[in-house]
Amino acid sequence: MRAWIFFLLCLAGKALAAPQQEALPDETEVVEETVAEVPVGANPVQVEVGEFDDGAEEAEEEVVAENPCQNHHCKHGKVCELDENNSPMCVCQDPTSCPAPIGEFEKVCSNDNKTFDSSCHFFATKCTLEGTKKGHKLHLDYIGPCKYIPPCLDSELTEFPLRMRDWLKNVLVTLYERDENNNLLTEKQKLRVKKIHENEKRLEAGDHPVELLARDFEKNYNMYIFPVHWQFGQLDQHPIDGYLSHTELAPLRAPLIPMEHCTTRFFQTCDLDNDKYIALDEWAGCFGIKEQDIDKDLVI
């Protein structure tokens, strides 16, 4: 369970970068986008340059003018280059130009069961296959080297949301405890989580049996309503439209699969109308939230 919390803390940034909106995959298709890019804040080290301020600004302007690619965004697998008119354009990255992996944790597994040294190597390779049938079918399945993922049994599927709900609640509480000046949560979110944090009946984080998790959900149902809505809002970013595509699910799904083999099947069953998107009511219903308690105003 602690490992679960670690992963979502790494993914809790609001900017879950995904360059395009894609529907949920069919049962044989998996996530294309993965790990989100957390927005970089201001440099905490502020250097006073005094009379050199103007010169520094001029130098910065010159650098920007000489490098049109500096603020030109390219999606995963592509890099910026200048054309004959000195205009920025995105081209496929050479996989051999990707940084050498530091360790096993950087490796990723594709849906054709091939391990890539890093997500950079995967997306660069996929880009070179753009326009081909193979490239269209190639997707990133999960984070980590390829391994055997056992099928998800019906009995196991019913247990998945029990752990997931408890995890979401614990992640929010952890973010609240660590927030202070880190801006991990908005003020509105803090007010909601504060009530959960101060509730004496709250089940502390731990590796609890599913029977205990089920009883706690029944007894302390109200504690779980906001965490489920909060996670939906964290994922619904590209665009913010009240629906989750498989691209938007990727930052949550990809790290979970090696630990929770029912992840893919769970998200597939959430799509009740099979339109390849998960709406808020479908998402909340998957976690046992009652229809009368589903409120888009809680997605804050």
Swiss-Prot record:
Amino acids binding Ca(2+): 271, 273, 275, 277, 282
GO cellular component, one term: basement membrane
Segments forming domain Follistatin-like: 68-90
InterPro entries associated with the record: EF-hand-dom_pair (IPR011992), EF_Hand_1_Ca_BS (IPR018247), Fol_N (IPR003645), Follistatin/Osteonectin_EGF (IPR015369), Kazal_dom (IPR002350), Kazal_dom_sf (IPR036058), Osteonectin_CS (IPR001999), SPARC/Testican_Ca-bd-dom (IPR019577)
Gene3D superfamilies hit by this protein: 3.30.60.30, EF-hand (1.10.238.10)
Residue intervals of the Kazal-like domain: 86-148
Function: Appears to regulate cell growth through interactions with the extracellular matrix and cytokines. Binds calcium and copper, several types of collagen, albumin, thrombospondin, PDGF and cell membranes. There are two calcium binding sites; an acidic domain that binds 5 to 8 Ca(2+) with a low affinity and an EF-hand loop that binds a Ca(2+) ion with a high affinity.
Molecular function per GO: calcium ion binding; collagen binding; extracellular matrix binding
Gene for this chain: SPARC
Location of the EF-hand domain: 258-293
Residues carrying sugar: 113
Localization terms from the record: Secreted, Extracellular space, Extracellular matrix, Basement membrane
Superkingdom of this protein's organism: Eukaryota
Listed name of the protein: SPARC
Signal peptide positions (record): 1-17
